[in-house]
């Protein structure tokens, strides 16, 4: 009997912990890939490449680390931005300062565990489908 109660208590604890982990509508880790074109320095020709981007929101979702790079190169950029969330519309924006600063990245939750991220690369608008990795 004691063993059954212990197992039930463990299951209840696990279920409640899982609910606590999923209590925030925005996952804290996202990543995705997108196609880019880069100029070959030797030939001057445009070459297709695949770039990756990841977002890691702080526990309180007030900041976000954006990390990106080209898959077949070793250059990776990593920068922290301020995050502003709109729970009603399930959107977020990232910028370098206060709320009125220029928006550098913006995204919207499209489905459970899916998000569309937008940003400009030069003059070109880039849209990337991101997948979530974990909740906190």
Regions found by a protein language model. Give the residues of each.
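Edge beta-strand at a domain terminus
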Residues: 73-85, 116-136
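C-terminal motif of bacterial Sec signal peptides marking the signal peptidase cleavage site
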Residues: 13-16
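Tryptophan-anchored aromatic micro-motifs
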Residues: 22-49, 85
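Sec-dependent signal peptide recognition
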Residues: 2-7
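N-terminal glycine/threonine-rich, aromatic-flanked beta-hairpin/loop signature
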Residues: 44-87
């Amino acid at each position: 009997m004691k063993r059954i109660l212990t197992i039930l208590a463990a299951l209840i604890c696990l279920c409640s912990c899982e609910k606590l982990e999923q209590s925030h509508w925005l996952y804290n880790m996202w990543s995705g890939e997108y196609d880019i074109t880069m100029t070959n320095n030797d030939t001057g020709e445009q070459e297709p490449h695949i770039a990756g981007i990841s977002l890691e929101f702080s526990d309180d979702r007030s900041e976000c680390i954006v990390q990106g790079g080209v898959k077949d190169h070793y250059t990776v950029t990593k920068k922290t931005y301020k995050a502003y969330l709109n729970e009603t519309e399930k959107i977020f924006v990232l910028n370098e300062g206060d709320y009125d600063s220029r928006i550098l990245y913006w995204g919207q939750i499209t489905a459970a565990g899916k998000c569309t991220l937008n940003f400009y690369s030069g003059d070109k608008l880039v849209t990337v489908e991101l997948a979530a990795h974990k909740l906190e």
